[in-house]
Amino acid sequence: MKKLKVMTVFGTRPEAIKMAPLVLELKKYPEIDSYVTVTAQHRQMLDQVLDAFHIKPDFDLNIMKERQTLAEITSNALVRLDELFKDIKPDIVLVHGDTTTTFAGSLAAFYHQIAVGHVEAGLRTGNKYSPFPEELNRQMTGAIADLHFAPTGQAKDNLLKENKKADSIFVTGNTAIDALNTTVRDGYSHPVLDQVGEDKMILLTAHRRENLGEPMENMFKAIRRIVGEFEDVQVVYPVHLNPVVREAAHKHFGDSDRVHLIEPLEVIDFHNFAAKSHFILTDSGGVQEEAPSLGKPVLVLRDTTERPEGVEAGTLKLAGTDEENIYQLAKQLLTDPDEYKKMSQASNPYGDGEASRRIVEELLFHYGYRKEQPDSFTGK
């Protein structure tokens, strides 16, 4: 029996963090020929993750250009992937989540009648402009995908409501938790953490396209109020490379000695910063999944989330982008021990560290290399 030719395609830092455990898992199985392709939609931040997990791509399309539009990213990725798929002819292409690379990769595969497996399938907000462009990217990828690897039961239900075939959906847990299990380390230290010392550290991430402009201004004003009121609080903000984000961050925090504006952290550093934080303010999707495993409350700086399981479990709260609301919720976590304890002890509904194994074993079952289907993630 010939080997199963599997190609993983990704292009951004968040994708790379979640695909890295799967890439490493695929290499363990003699039945599989694994190819790694990166579009490098985010060049520098992607390379940090590849280096951290010791992954060398087989194909690097290197499409990154400064301030390129969504249309340019899509068209560049589509043309380059079209050429690659024509040459390599994989049996299945695995894409992740909701980036422009995800959509372009699935569309290019469809044009060649190559099967598509969608990792982290079924997340939905129901608003095609929130998050933008991610919500529609994942819906369109879902329309193309042949196999849907849903992280949770809720994600599976979303797909069933869209009339996806039940036997094409597999609940695996989220590969983000697989990654976390290998990166958080006892005795971790960093010069920035030394500067924070014994103060309470709030870890901030803010970069989403739909939050640029007034929403981000409101977030930053709320954070200024928090550090102005609480002398034992410091904020660490690894600032995204987007020039618009960097300009706003330096405008609001450039003169603050208790808001540390630092370069984007490598994945191992970021996970360990999160583990040592008091709580997290974020508009990132991945952080919403990772923090529950670390016992850290999360205030989500968005009006919607495609990860309602965390809200239901109690570890996430939607803070939105209103200055007063963000301020009040952050203040509550700093002054109400019971509320902090309640949020920090919530269970993680997103994974158990076995998602990558389940995905690979499901592929082998689907293509006839294994007789038994793997277990599903139950979230318990």
UniProtKB/Swiss-Prot annotation:
For this UniProt entry, what's an example GO CC term? Answer: cytoplasm
The record's section on SUPFAM superfamilies has:
UDP-Glycosyltransferase/glycogen phosphorylase
Consequence of mutating residue 69 to I? In TS-21; temperature-sensitive, develops, at the nonpermissive temperature (47 degrees Celsius), a coccoid-like morphology, i.e. a phenotype associated with a deficient synthesis of poly(glycerol phosphate) teichoic acid
Q: Pathway listed for it?
A: Cell wall biogenesis; poly(glycerol phosphate) teichoic acid biosynthesis
Keyword check for Cell inner membrane: no
> What sort of enzyme, by top EC class, is this?
isomerase
Q: Which NCBIfam families did the record assign?
A: wecB
Instruction: Name the job this protein performs.
Output: Catalyzes the conversion of UDP-N-acetylglucosamine into UDP-N-acetylmannosamine, a precursor of the teichoic acid linkage unit.
- What name is this protein filed under? UDP-N-acetylglucosamine 2-epimerase
Reactions accelerated catalytically: UDP-N-acetyl-alpha-D-glucosamine = UDP-N-acetyl-alpha-D-mannosamine
